UniProtKB/Swiss-Prot annotation:
Superkingdom of the source species: Bacteria
Protein name, UniProt field: 3-isopropylmalate dehydratase large subunit
Record EC number: 4.2.1.33
Annotated metabolic or biological route of this protein: Amino-acid biosynthesis; L-leucine biosynthesis; L-leucine from 3-methyl-2-oxobutanoate: step 2/4
Role: Catalyzes the isomerization between 2-isopropylmalate and 3-isopropylmalate, via the formation of 2-isopropylmaleate.
Organism: Haemophilus influenzae (strain PittEE)
């Protein structure tokens, strides 16, 4: 029987299935952080249950921590409570924790792959919507709620209904200067933010294969932003090269056996997908969101669309509301839009390749006078260490940016990195919802190079026209 990659992953993890009932899946890897885990551990204590498989769960601190201090005692309010609770709960249960005193600590979706915890063929869950990131390795990875976090801790299983399958093929090669972030934003622009609803998406095509693992993680990270349950990219030699010798990756004969199995994790040639979407890579230009969801996105060289010209009444109403909030008018050229802040970071774009791309733009330049602040936040302590080894931190600081410690930072208004009211930000994060980066903050999603350029020129520019150093 021919199967898609998703079907192979799903079927191979079924623990129990009966007619008329939702299948129960075995979970290979459970990642936790300080925000969605405290109530789950409380639930275990109330029910007098233990963590079933301690060695399958790993924790880190990322969402609410400060990127300015590494001392828990200097945290305030809810952030301090959450961090201390995670520390207490992991010590009590024996779960491995990468806390803020270690260089292995980082954003959960950066730390997991770095440590080799993310492997092809796995089922991976986390109490975070961007768990789809790990699908870049050919793993079935998706976000879960706090009650499900408790269930996985207690049983190492999860009830999960089958999703539909979608194939998104990006044909050919992208032009110079076009990144994984541009590819996924262009995809969401075509499908809309609801285009993948009810589906698990497999990304394929030459443009996807050409991406590094870091680029592939960027693509899968934002699968949720088109409404998909998860995103997948079949593993290949690029995947294996990235994983080899990672701390938790198989070693010796186990590695050889694992690679032999991983090579089978491909959709069969005649596999049927419920939905197929194709894009031509050559048509993708640098992308900038203009509204309040990632599907409201255009090329930097285009003008903001007129809601009155939209045939769909729901889309029209959404666009009108978005433009009112974002403070822009239909017909505006994006290259005329000035920014107040720049954020380079998040689980979408805080890896070493992202920082190198930003540094290439910022080297030898200075922050524009109208830009109040540029935050550069590495995704983990190991990324920070590598960036400093390469001297990237000095480039950022010389350009007028702030070089921070690892954390989710300004991706979400849950810590002390926030936009001021009605400030406009060029951000490498994954969501531009109303208030996402702070009360009444205005967010435009872009690639790291585009964000860095906005910081240097004070407005959006076409990165293809910027000399790199």
């Amino acid at each position: 029987m021919v199967k898609t990659l998703y079907e192979k992953l799903f079927d191979s993890h079924i623990v129990y299935e009966a007619e008329g009932e939702t299948p129960i899946l075995y979970i290979n890897r459970h990642l936790i952080h300080e925000v969605t885990s405290p109530q789950a551990f409380d639930g275990l204590r109330v029910a007098n249950r233990q963590v079933r498989q301690v060695n399958k769960t790993f924790g880190t601190m990322d969402h609410s921590i400060s990127t300015q201090v590494r001392d828990v005692n200097k945290l305030e309010g809810q952030a301090k409570i959450q961090v201390l609770e995670l520390d207490k709960n992991t010590k009590a249960t024996g779960i491995k924790l990468f806390d803020i005193t270690t260089k292995e600590q980082g954003i959960v979706h950066v730390m997991g792959p770095e440590q080799g915890l993310t492997l092809p063929g796995m089922t991976i869950v986390c109490g975070d919507s961007h768990t789809a990131t790990h699908g870049a390795f050919g793993a079935l990875a998706f976000g879960i709620g706090t009650s499900e976090v408790e269930h996985v801790l207690a049983t190492q299983t999860l009830k999960q209904a089958r999703a539909k399958s979608m194939k998104i093929e990006v044909r050919g090669k992208v032009a110079s200067g076009i990144t994984a972030k541009d590819i996924i934003l262009a995809i969401i622009g075509k499908t809309t933010m609801a285009g993948g609803t009810g589906h698990v998406v497999e990304f394929c095509g030459e443009a996807i294969r050409d991406l590094s693992m870091e680029g592939r993680m960027t693509v899968c990270n934002m699968a949720i932003e088109m409404g998909a349950k998860a995103g997948l990219i079949a593993p290949d030699e690029t995947t294996f090269a990235y994983l080899k010798d990672r701390p938790h990756a198989p070693k010796g004969k186990d590695w050889d056996d694992a690679v032999a199995y991983w090579k089978t994790l491909q959709s069969d040639d005649d596999a049927q997908f419920d939905t197929v979407v194709t894009l031509e890579a050559k048509d993708i230009a640098p992308q900038v969101t203009w509204g309040t969801n990632p599907g409201q996105v255009i090329s930097v060289n285009e003008t903001i669309p007129n809601p009155q010209e939209m045939a769909d009444l729901v889309q029209r109403a959404s666009a009108e509301k978005a433009l009112h909030y974002i403070g822009l008018e239909a017909g505006t050229n994006l290259k005329e839009v000035k920014v107040d802040q720049v954020f380079i970071g998040s689980c979408t774009n805080s890896r070493i390749e992202d920082l190198r791309a930003a540094a290439a733009v910022m080297k030898g330049r200075k922050k524009a006078d109208n830009v109040k602040r540029i935050l550069v936040v590495p995704g983990s302590g190991l990324v920070k260490e590598q960036a400093e080894k390469e001297g990237l931190d000095k480039i950022f600081i010389a350009a007028g940016a702030e070089w921070r410690n690892p954390g989710c930072s300004m991706c979400l208004g849950m810590n002390d990195d926030r936009l001021g009211e009605w400030e406009r930000c060029a951000s490498t994060s994954n969501r531009n919802f109303e208030g996402r980066q702070g009360r009444n903050g205005r967010t435009h999603l872009v690639s790291p190079a585009m964000a860095a350029a906005a910081g240097m020129f004070g407005k959006f520019v076409d990165i293809r026209e910027v000399a790199l150093n």
